[in-house]
Amino acid sequence: MDIKLKRTYDPPETDDGYRVLVDHLWPRGIKKENLHADEWAKSIAPSTECRKAFNHDPERFENFVSAYTAELDSNPDAATFVTQLKQLAPTTVTLLFSDKDTVYNNAVILKKWLQAKLG
């Protein structure tokens, strides 16, 4: 299964496959009908405490990776999401995030975690 990352502000493309918003909050300035998301998986987004501890600081990213990965490992909704994605295979899945930083964000961590779980 191919897992892609894309900002919510980038236009949808035909090869995006199944599009999932993975942020806890709805992206500013985007109407629901304009996002073209198949799902909003906010229950597997990082907790408010985890996000605030990271505070978009690249120097704190390693700690954010550890904290968010631990949340995913203990979150039954994350396990259900993995099962759901297995049923979609071989469809491409695009994880949508609103962060301006395309390197240090929760979607990057989630993609790596999902790839490990999906094999």
Regions found by a protein language model. Name each.
Residues 1-119:
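Residues lining hydrophobic/aromatic ligand-binding pockets adjacent to catalytic sites
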